[in-house]
């Protein structure tokens, strides 16, 4: 069945791709740009910024069927279906997609994008360019669509079911029916992030609209998923999947609470251990699990149906859990009890409102509870099979123009199986811990806890923690502060509120690091002829901005990086500053672990709590505990502490990151206009608050090399929610600079222009040291570089032969004092695009500051 419809789909996709071999990156076009007879432009895009690599399409299919191959339109490489972790050739999805069914007159119609047989594909996009997938990213501030971007990787696709041409939609030979459109349009938006807390899930947001002129009655929406989990090298991987539903788990982040998950999970049945040793092949084995989390459905209700089944050519093996009905159990086409093949059967399953038990429990006879008795091979099914499942929502009535929202998260989690665990310890053998954490973060990113998105005063559900050492418990809050329930009434010296659920209004926004500072560079050559680059920045916005989730200032520190190439993977940490604060570990007797329960404590807060001379450093592990007698309950409490980051908090050392104005107190006001008017001594000549002015001097640099320098900002994370510190990316704000005298110094001192290397030797092997360092794939002839330095910011360089012929003219035009404004290069190629020969050459540098003349030698 899979082979048949995949072959037809391959033909259709290749036909569309051949007709329109174009880039995916295009903005939305308001007026039609295609001809009526053009075919739909079927294409794909790859989510790969996080740890999941997953293919989405503009014809409704999520993933890539294992019987076919598709290729990334950007890279040309084979497209992954759902690899996790990416790069390890382990797949967790065959395909997924929407089912939409409705009653239209006397007909029951269902449109599907996946899970239909024999080459049927009923959703299609418009022709190119309207049908193309739009790409947006918060990483691209220069894109015209930056302001509307949601994540680091947004894909937007629009498709409809309006095409009824059987040559495109395919023909169902079993049911002998052609596609009959509902006339619906789906806008599919998918979002992914690369941050540590969000790189294990992808959000998919669907808007399903009735674009016909008729009402659609009793509409049901379903999400079909076929996982087929295993190594890509294993052609039989789809025969041993397991799946089930997980309602809730005990919270690991707020003691005493239960985390509501409501996920449908799927995994390989055993993680494919080595048959001899029983060990797993690390990330190259299917030891992870995946889940589908429903975040929003098209109604205020939160209920939905869950059905799973085995699809097989053998009708007797095609089976799924079914409830007994008064008129008997409905059998699907061919007497099947599993896979619904006709529109009527698909609609019946979506409307059944059944919620199946877990596949791993299929062997258990539930006939007394109203279910069909298990089949003869129930034990085999329980241990793994080719499973599909469907989540269904409805019914709804849709008038023309109405739209239904549906938002889901595809979540992955590691260590579902791991070495040292075995079937004898089932709960440890199949660990949901990673899925639990990643599901929570998907939920929080969708609807941010503590954020009043619609301005109605509701920020979601929360708990209040009492943080002072005399109290060690959680106060329960129900609905509003007026309904606070306390076990004991007392005053907390230090309190904190933790929101754990949003206000019900989608945000689609993740936690972000502090705003990165804008740096300015001031290069120079010192008296020892050593290059230096002074890096300056103002941290006002960085240090006063609040975190999206905690609504608190969570700035932790700065880091200085440098790179020779500018490559994202080539940046090296050279210096850092972070606040002096500590994580406090307390013992959880129920889990028998030491854990961090609160945000980091500053040294000032710790001394307020434990005495003005308190030093946490001697209490650094469970063998070196700090004992404190809590007089309120009359018992001893024990903690240990670890530095949160390095605690490099000395800002007076001029060899490290330091304050430009070390004696400047904290500002009297954070309003710049007010400060300039009433506190001018607190403001720099550039109009910035002096207190937040920093600098770092990079020393002993080679003036002949370019350096990429950057300053990042990072926060302290949220240890209680498993969120590690977030840091801005070094390469996103890097400045390319030479450790030479700046153009300002060159102009003020009328410095002599210098050319290097002089002489330039073709056999000098400069490429090994600095030539072509930024373009290593280019030929040597095109990466040669003769350097000019001590240039004014705006001038004209002309190169002449010894006979006075003009060889090359170079226009040098930079803003005054801009990075690199003192420097330029020539690739030894003439104005006629010819490589020059050996000889003596003259040059002139003309600017408003005068004209300089010099010469250099080229030796072949």
What does each model-found stretch correspond to?
Residues 20-860:
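Extracellular/surface-associated beta-sandwich interaction domains
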Residues 1-5, 860:
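Positively charged n-region of N-terminal signal peptides that target proteins for export
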Residues 6-16:
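Bacterial N-terminal signal peptides
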């Amino acid at each position: 069945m899979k082979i048949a419809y995949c072959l037809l789909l391959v033909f259709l996709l290749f036909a569309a791709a051949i007709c329109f071999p174009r880039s995916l990156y295009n903005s939305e076009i308001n007026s039609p740009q295609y001809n009526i007879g053009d075919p739909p432009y079927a294409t794909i895009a790859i989510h790969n910024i996080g740890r999941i690599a997953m293919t989405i399409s503009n014809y409704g299919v999520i993933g890539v069927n294992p019987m076919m191959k598709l290729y990334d339109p950007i890279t040309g490489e084979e497209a992954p279906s759902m690899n996790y972790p990416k790069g390890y050739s382990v797949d967790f999805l065959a395909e997924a997609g929407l089912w939409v069914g409705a009653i239209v007159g006397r007909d029951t119609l269902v449109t599907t994008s996946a899970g239909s047989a024999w080459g049927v594909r009923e959703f299609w996009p418009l022709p190119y360019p309207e049908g193309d997938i739009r790409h947006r990213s918060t990483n691209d501030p220069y894109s015209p669509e930056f302001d509307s971007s949601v994540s680091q990787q947004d894909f937007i696709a629009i498709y409809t079911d309006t095409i009824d041409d059987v040559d495109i939609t395919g023909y169902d030979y079993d049911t002998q029916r052609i596609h009959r459109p509902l006339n619906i349009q789906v806008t599919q938006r998918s979002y992914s992030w690369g941050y540590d807390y969000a790189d294990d899930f992808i959000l998919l947001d669907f808007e399903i609209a009735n674009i016909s002129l008729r009402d659609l009655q009793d509409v049901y929406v379903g999400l079909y998923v076929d996982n087929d989990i295993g190594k890509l090298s294993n052609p039989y991987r789809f025969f041993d999947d397991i799946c089930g539903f997980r309602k809730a788990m005990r919270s690991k982040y707020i003691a005493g609470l239960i985390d509501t998950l409501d996920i449908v999970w799927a995994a390989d049945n055993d993680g494919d251990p080595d048959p001899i040793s029983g060990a797993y092949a690390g990330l190259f084995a299917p030891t992870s699990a995946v889940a589908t989390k429903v975040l929003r459905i098209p109604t205020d209700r939160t209920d939905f149906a869950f059905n799973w089944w085995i699809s097989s050519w053998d009708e007797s093996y095609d089976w799924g859990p079914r409830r007994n009905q008064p008129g008997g159990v409905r059998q699907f086409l061919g007497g099947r009890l599993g896979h619904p093949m006709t529109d009527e059967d698909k609609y019946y399953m979506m409307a059944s409102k059944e919620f199946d038990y877990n596949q791993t429990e299929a062997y258990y006879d539930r006939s007394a509870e109203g279910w069909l008795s298990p089949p003869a091979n129930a034990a085999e099914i329980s241990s793994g099979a080719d499973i599909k499942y469907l989540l269904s929502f409805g019914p709804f009535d849709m008038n023309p123009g109405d739209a239904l929202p549906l938002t889901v998260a595809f979540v992955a989690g590691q260590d579902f199986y791991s070495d040292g665990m075995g079937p004898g310890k089932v709960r440890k053998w199949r660990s949901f811990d990673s899925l639990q954490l990643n599901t929570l973060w998907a939920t929080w990113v969708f609807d941010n806890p503590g954020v009043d998105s619609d301005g109605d005063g509701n920020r979601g559900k929360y708990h209040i923690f009492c943080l002072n050492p005399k109290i060690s418990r959680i106060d329960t809050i129900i609905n509003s502060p007026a309904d606070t329930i306390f076990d004991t009434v007392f005053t907390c010296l230090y309190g904190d509120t933790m929101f754990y659920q949003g206000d019900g209004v989608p945000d689609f926004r993740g936690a972000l690091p502090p705003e990165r500072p804008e740096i300015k560079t001031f290069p120079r050559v010192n008296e020892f002829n050593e290059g230096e680059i002074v890096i300056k920045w103002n941290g006002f916005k960085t240090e006063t901005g609040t975190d999206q989730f905690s609504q608190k200032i969570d700035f932790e520190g700065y880091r200085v990086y440098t790179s020779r190439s500018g490559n994202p993977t080539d940046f090296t940490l050279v210096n850092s500053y972070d606040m002096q604060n500590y994580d406090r570990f307390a013992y959880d007797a129920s889990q028998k672990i030491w854990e961090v329960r609160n945000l980091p404590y500053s040294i000032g807060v710790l001394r307020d709590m434990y005495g003005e001379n308190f030093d946490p450093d001697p209490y650094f592990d469970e063998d070196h505990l700090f004992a404190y007698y809590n007089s309120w309950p009359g018992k001893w409490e024990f903690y240990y502490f670890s530095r949160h980051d390095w605690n490099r908090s000395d800002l007076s050392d001029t060899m490290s990151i330091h304050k430009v104005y070390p004696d400047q107190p904290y500002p009297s006001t954070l309003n710049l206009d007010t400060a300039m008017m009433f506190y001018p001594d607190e403001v720099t000549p550039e109009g910035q608050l002096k207190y937040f002015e920093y600098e770092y001097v990079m020393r002993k640099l080679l003036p002949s090399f370019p350096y990429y320098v950057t300053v990042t900002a990072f926060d302290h994370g949220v240890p209680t929610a498993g969120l590690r510190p977030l840091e801005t990316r070094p390469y996103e704000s890097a400045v390319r600079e030479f450790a030479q005298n700046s153009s300002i110094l060159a102009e003020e001192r009328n410095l002599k222009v210098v050319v290097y290397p002089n002489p330039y030797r073709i056999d000098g092997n400069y490429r090994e040291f600095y030539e072509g360092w930024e373009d290593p794939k280019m030929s040597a002839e095109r990466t040669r570089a003769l350097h000019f330095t001590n240039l004014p910011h705006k001038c004209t360089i002309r190169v002449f032969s010894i006979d006075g012929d003009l060889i090359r003219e170079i226009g040098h035009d930079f803003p005054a004092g801009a990075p690199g404004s003192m420097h330029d290069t020539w690739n030894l190629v003439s104005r006629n695009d010819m490589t020059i020969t050996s000889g003596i050459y003259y040059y002139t540098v003309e600017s408003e500051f005068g004209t300089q003349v010099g010469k250099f030698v080229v030796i072949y």
